[in-house]
């Protein structure tokens, strides 16, 4: 597979995402600047963490209007793989590709530490290499990771099995302990924790690696069956 890492002004986890794909997975990856208007030739899109446009107005609120985002929407509508991590998750929500909103953490402080997650659905293209209900350890680094949605949306997420990851010990107040969700089609995932920072033992663990290996296996299968 060939991946595009979207770079917005203020992105700071693009290097980590690039490293996870190129060095940990050995897959092809390129940076794509936010002013571009084509994703032709790519099989997957990765929206990294950071502080796009300085997080002015709201996290991701300005980035959603970047030229590349219209192409990301088209890409997602075609059933292709889109992953947004931390600020990338916030951008996906602001762009309407995922439901809900991300508020300030309940403690009103930026948090940077490792947390435990539970794999709620291992039947997505992002989680198939994990065991059902597997507990994994992944870093977080955010000040606005408190996921919220209304009752109807939360019921929909549960019914459609769109909740991919939950926190075992909720650090930010997210509704239902939600750490990551997919769209209804299952080809778009947004999550606040950083799997790209957990792909090597040297840097603290490899629990994030299975997300990327799942993505490659399932994504490659999807590409083959839809060409």
From Swiss-Prot:
Swiss-Prot/TrEMBL keywords: ATP-binding, Cytoplasm, Glutamine amidotransferase, Hydrolase, Ligase, Nucleotide-binding, Purine biosynthesis
Taxonomy, superkingdom: Bacteria
Catalytic activity: N(2)-formyl-N(1)-(5-phospho-beta-D-ribosyl)glycinamide + L-glutamine + ATP + H2O = 2-formamido-N(1)-(5-O-phospho-beta-D-ribosyl)acetamidine + L-glutamate + ADP + phosphate + H(+); L-glutamine + H2O = L-glutamate + NH4(+)
Gene Ontology annotations for the cellular component aspect, listed alphabetically: cytoplasm
Cellular location(s): Cytoplasm
Database matches in InterPro entries: Class_I_gatase-like, PRibForGlyAmidine_synth_PurQ
Pfam families: GATase_5
EC number: 6.3.5.3, 3.5.1.2
Protein task: Part of the phosphoribosylformylglycinamidine synthase complex involved in the purines biosynthetic pathway. Catalyzes the ATP-dependent conversion of formylglycinamide ribonucleotide (FGAR) and glutamine to yield formylglycinamidine ribonucleotide (FGAM) and glutamate. The FGAM synthase complex is composed of three subunits. PurQ produces an ammonia molecule by converting glutamine to glutamate. PurL transfers the ammonia molecule to FGAR to form FGAM in an ATP-dependent manner.
Protein name: Phosphoribosylformylglycinamidine synthase subunit PurQ
Organism in which the protein naturally occurs: Exiguobacterium sibiricum (strain DSM 17290 / CCUG 55495 / CIP 109462 / JCM 13490 / 255-15)
